[in-house]
Design a protein with these regions (language model features):
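Active-site loop/oxyanion-hole signature of alpha/beta-hydrolase fold enzymes
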Residues: 58-102
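Conserved HGGG/HGGXW glycine-rich cap/lid loop of the alpha/beta-hydrolase fold
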Residues: 15-70
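Flexible "cap/lid" loop of the alpha/beta hydrolase fold
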Residues: 112, 116, 122-153
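Catalytic active-site module of serine/aspartate enzymes centered on a nucleophile-bearing elbow/loop
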Residues: 240-277
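Conserved loop-alpha-helix segment in the C-terminal half of the alpha/beta-hydrolase fold
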Residues: 214-249
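Gly/Ala-rich beta-loop-alpha elbow adjacent to hydrolase catalytic centers
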Residues: 103-107, 111
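Conserved alpha/beta-hydrolase catalytic His-Asp/Glu region
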Residues: 136-137, 152-209
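Short beta-to-alpha linker loops that shape the active-site pocket of alpha/beta-hydrolase fold enzymes
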Residues: 61-66, 131, 249-250
Length: 277
């Protein structure tokens, strides 16, 4: 169990294929289920706690190792697809038939896999800070910051409230240690479109979206700027989507204003199932 990747009580589940998944569980008294995936749950935990006021929330750690069934042509694991399959297998094992899915940045990848392969289990899908990229990349600021040695520069670009947010982020990284990084991150974590064989297939599925999709971005997020044209195009082609850009917000919005992240999810879910015809 990767208990160090969760702040507070951590649990684990052994899937039928023998893989162990680490997860947290909050809001057990609520009827509706929400699943959210992430590499770790420390600075994102306040969002989980807020979501748990309305939903029975499972936060599932997206793993970097172990066996997998979703493979690349060369036999290596396609981690983008495997993260999605893990969430699906988790839900099946837990007896969860349908659920809301919320992902932020890399955490959206399992949601897009479910959207593509098992939309029947999704009530709706909050895809926050990331959309499939159908129009290419205009810059590479975010991953250049991540790979650089200037932590203060990266944090200043990633959050508004550096003075309060930086200590929390550094505490998180200390708890996680070397397990925070993997070659899977730059290859799969910011590229939902890689779940499809072609961009044409991806666009077709967006045009015929089988479940409500809620996009949210921060106007000052470097990753938003890196894929600006693609993000705006996703808004145009995703059938019936909810699309929000929050002025002034940056990438680590869960540190700056976790309440608004949760509130945007609540607003989207409330509107997603109303009949506007």
């Amino acid at each position: 169990m990767e208990a160090n990747k969760i702040k507070g009580e951590a649990k684990s589940l052994i899937l039928d294929n023998g893989v162990e998944l680490t997860y947290c569980e909050r809001g057990e008294g609520n009827k509706e289920v929400m699943i959210t995936g992430a590499f770790y749950f420390h600075t994102f935990m306040p969002v989980v706690e807020l979501l748990a006021k309305h939903y029975h929330v499972y936060g599932v750690v997206m793993r970097f190792d172990g066996s997998g069934e979703e493979l690349e042509p060369d036999g290596s694991i396609h981690w983008g697809r495997q993260w999605g399959k893990d969430i699906y297998d988790f839900a099946v094992k837990m007896g969860i038939e349908r659920f809301h899915y919320l992902g932020k940045c890399h955490g959206t990848i399992p949601g897009w896999w479910l959207f593509k392969n098992h939309p029947e289990v999704l009530i709706d899908f909050c895809s926050f800070f990331l959309a499939p990229h159908l129009k290419g990349q205009t810059s590479n600021t975010w991953f250049e910051l991540l790979s650089g040695n200037d932590t203060s520069k990266m944090m200043a670009a990633a959050m508004r409230k550096v003075e309060t947010g930086l200590p929390k982020k550094m505490e998180e990284m200390k708890s996680i240690g070397n397990s925070a990084s993997s070659p899977a991150v730059p290859k799969y974590a910011a590229c939902p479109e890689k779940l499809w064989d072609t961009l044409e297939d991806c666009e077709r599925d967006l045009l015929n979206a089988p479940v409500p999709v809620g996009y949210m971005f921060g106007s000052e997020d470097p990753l938003m700027a890196d894929y600006f044209e693609s993000n705006m195009y996703a808004w145009k082609v995703t059938r019936g989507c909810h699309f929000t850009i929050l002025n002034g917000e940056k990438h680590l919005m869960e540190l700056d204003t976790p309440e608004r992240v949760a509130d945007e999810a609540f607003v989207f879910i409330d509107q997603a199932h109303k009949d506007y015809e």
